[in-house]
């Protein structure tokens, strides 16, 4: 199962039938921001591990949108007993950025024209497109595109200000595998080779 949006429907499904998670071979999610890294030239990196670490409050992108929209469903999904729990969060997806002129050159296949149309709308506000969901889809078929670490992700639901925040704790016996790095060149190769 691949999840690239807020987890309301999946959380509801799991709540309605708690046996469903155990029937899944794997769940791959674009969700959360397991670690926080600034890509503005300061090279500041911090782990998002401690509830007392409130410096992240003012940092853009620390709470990922899918988790923010429905933190309770997100918590339920991450707590479900799935055979394999895989996450690609903002810590890796935000590294896959393309400028408008690059997209115009690359998105020339007929199947990509609707994607380019959507990207053009995005460019009106952002001047870039970020490949959040495509990385999640590519990693489903090509796990070598990311370096994963095992651990435990917990979702904040008690704090009004931090609702949806993801707490990451590395643990070799943990239930979650989280992408910590991405091979950009390999990602673009896998993504676009299907359109040749």
Name these PLM-found stretches.
Residues 1-87, 93:
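Active-site histidine-anchored catalytic micro-motif
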